[in-house]
């Protein structure tokens, strides 16, 4: 099963029939994509989901805006812009920083044509 862009996509694709279960499934898939470790410090315990751009600052519940995060990092970061907060941490890792930046990149546009469109030969 793939990871969808939001909990609502799990409902739309009939992976589940309740919004609560869709959100649980979405959160579980995000943690799985991060190998069940905190995106910031690498801890494996007390994992939560963190909005990279906090909802209070306009962040949304989309996969590209959330990462697997330990409880301590989530509480410490709070509403601080993530880069400002992360650069000030003693556990800062350039590799983890790059991985988060890569995660945040939008997906490439989907090619809607499954086959080459026909040319109109009428001239």
Q: What label would you give each PLM region?
A:
Residues 74-91, 103-111:
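Low-complexity, flexible helical/coil segments
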Residues 39-68, 77-87:
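Histidine-centered nuclease catalytic patch
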Residues 17, 25-28, 53, 57, ...:
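A general structural-boundary detector
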Residues 8, 12-16, 30-31, 48, ...:
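A generic structural signal for ordered alpha-helices
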Residues 22, 30, 78-81, 99:
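Acidic, low-complexity intrinsically disordered regions
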Residues 1-24, 95-123:
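A boundary/linker detector
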